[in-house]
Amino acid sequence: MEKGAVTLEGIGGEQIPLERADVVIMNPPFTRQQRIPVSYKEILIKRFSAEVSYIHGQMGYYGYFIILANRFLKDGGRLALVLPASVLNADGLLKVRKFLADQYHIEHIITTWQRAAFSENAQFREILLIAKKKVNKLKDDVCTITELKILPHDLTEARNIAEKIAQISKVKKHGVVYDDKDIQISLFTMDEIRNSVDNLFKFLAFSDKRLVDIWQSITERLGNRLATFGKYLKDNGPLEGVALGQIVKGGGIGYFYIHRTKDRMLKKEDVWLLRETKEDGIDVEHKLLLMTVHIPWRALRCALRRFSGFSTLDISNELDYMVVDDFPDAKIFLKTLDKKLDPNLLSKWNAYTSRLLGNIFLVNHADISAPGTAILSYYSSKMALVPRSMWSMRISDLSAKIFTLWLNSSLNLLQLLLLRRETRGAYLWFVAGDIKKFLVLDVEKLSEDEIGNLLQIFDKVRGVSFPCVLEQLRGRFWARVEIDRAILKVLGFNEQETNQLLDYLYPALTKEIEQLKTLMQG
């Protein structure tokens, strides 16, 4: 390594010898892998050729820093790292998690419920991870999960908390071993950690640890009635919604939407309003220029501009339109954009959007605590396009209806919160790989009567306007209860079991979402 080095190739500066250390403390950059240039990744992989088996192409900078720290740490030494919580379940860090679980005794994972991060002005949730580099694995190695409900105000309080954690870590118990108004401490064996490297986030996904047990007991008891979503999606999703930037840099996709009503025209680029529906197409009007253009059906697709404010499961009759292909007045239409576009680009746009059509949609980057978030998954009887803030999937109409019920159920809400990529509190974020792993009702194993009962419930609630998710849970909104009861019945729960489970889930999930909302505000 060189003092004054300006490139990864080590150019310039005088040599500084680095010795192996007993302790390595780091707060590495949280830069996402998407922002690392491909050429830079190639150099990093070359630099870490000895550890290439731990490197993933979608690994952020902090993953490389963990590997770097290992190079300079003595056997028996300790790592102390400030990391984004996403390190616990991101696919790109799976190899690093396996490396830490195999080569280290992960002694402590510490987080806080008071605010998203320990660092000032940080937007993403953080954890503190302390691990000891070990040569031999011991059966009695324990990982202590500490969740601070209140952050220490000064050094004295911090020292007292550290002493309490150290003392409780020696207790020969399992699960939640200490819980008061300031702190919750849980103990898990390293074998449990190693067996859970796919999703270590589950150990701190909920303040109420019983919720994890409920989900695990359901999957163990009813695994034969559930299947992965990927079994039904196959190659038909999930696909991210449309983005004009995939075809034209800096383009505003709102210019391509035809809005059904004025109240949906919220942004500057939302300029086209549906004026009249005709046999051969639609007439649309520019809200500022007051000019009218006729667009034939062949150049249009049904589309959803944004999911916020849509509160029904079935959006078939609420969809807007999107221009996706060339038409006689296309040049006039494109002239109203804030930049010049070649009409020939519409053929590329058509090919791109055609691949993204779906009939069941899942929200992404959604604030589950927001007043405008009422539905998590939408159904459409017409193939449609959705924005980048949603996932699009294409399956049979029958399965789409049943999965829409499941994805909006309280059992699935429990699953979503457990598997979410932690970013900013109540925001739900998933990647395609996560969604394919979701457990859903195995439609192929349902009887005709069970399918008929579920479709009957779907028809009953498909047009109902749901309040926001929090209000649904707080007030036990009747349509949510109908969905939950129908699904639990299919899964084999009797009346008493159903009542007991829902009586616990509704207030518990409400509390968790409110807690996540507090994280964002803190």
Regions found by a protein language model. Give the residues of each.
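Alpha-helix boundary/N-cap detector
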Residues: 156, 295, 449-452, 474, ...
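Short, conserved secondary-structure transition motifs
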Residues: 1, 115-122, 481-494
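Generic, well-ordered alpha-helical scaffold segments in large soluble proteins
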Residues: 24-27, 31, 68, 72, ...
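Signature of N6-adenine DNA methyltransferases within the class I
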Residues: 14-256
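S-adenosyl-L-methionine
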Residues: 1-12
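Flexible helix-coil linker/hinge segments at domain or subdomain boundaries
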Residues: 460-479, 483-486, 490
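Polybasic, glycine- and aromatic-enriched phosphate-binding surface used to engage nucleic acids
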Residues: 63, 73, 204, 209-460, ...
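Conserved AMP-binding
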Residues: 485-522
